[in-house]
Amino acid sequence: SDAAAALDWVQSLHPDSKSCWVAGYSFGSWIGMQLLMRRPEIEGFISIAPQPNTYDFSFLAPCPSSGLIIHGDADKVAPAKDVQGLVDKLHTQKGITITQKTLPGANHFFANDSELLLDECADYLDRRLNGELADPRPKRLR
């Protein structure tokens, strides 16, 4: 896939890196999660405005890594209730920590909320890499 080829390319530029993360927005979050399932070196993820109402995320059983799911409560493309259903399913899995952030008033495109989105993602990364939210180097469930 294109995502796997992109990851291979990035890893070729940084051969000494011991880990990596994946992030995706909308359909890209589904692609990123597919990649997460196939690549054991991926230690975490950020899924922005995933669309479980459109794309099947049932392959995330079990989800091998902890991560952030962030979305807006005014998203009409990926309704909050559908994203909540995905988060609820992931919360039942052992060995991972799923952090959910719901941005009040934010739509699917985060119009007028892009700075808040960036701040929330940066805060999550800082806290996660400091070991506050989940083990910074989790053991994968494989």
Predicted feature residues:
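Alpha/beta-hydrolase active-site loop
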Residues: S1-H14
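Alpha/beta-hydrolase fold nucleophile elbow
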Residues: H14-Y25
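Gly/Ala-rich beta-loop-alpha elbow adjacent to hydrolase catalytic centers
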Residues: G24-G32
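Short beta-strand/loop motif that positions the catalytic acidic residue
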Residues: C63, L68-H71, D75
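Short alpha-helix in the alpha/beta-hydrolase fold that links the catalytic acid
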Residues: S65, P79-K89
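Acidic catalytic loop of the alpha/beta-hydrolase fold
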Residues: D73-A78, H108-F109
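Catalytic histidine neighborhood in serine/cysteine hydrolases
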Residues: L90-F109
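Catalytic histidine-centered segment of alpha/beta-hydrolase-like enzymes
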Residues: A106-L118
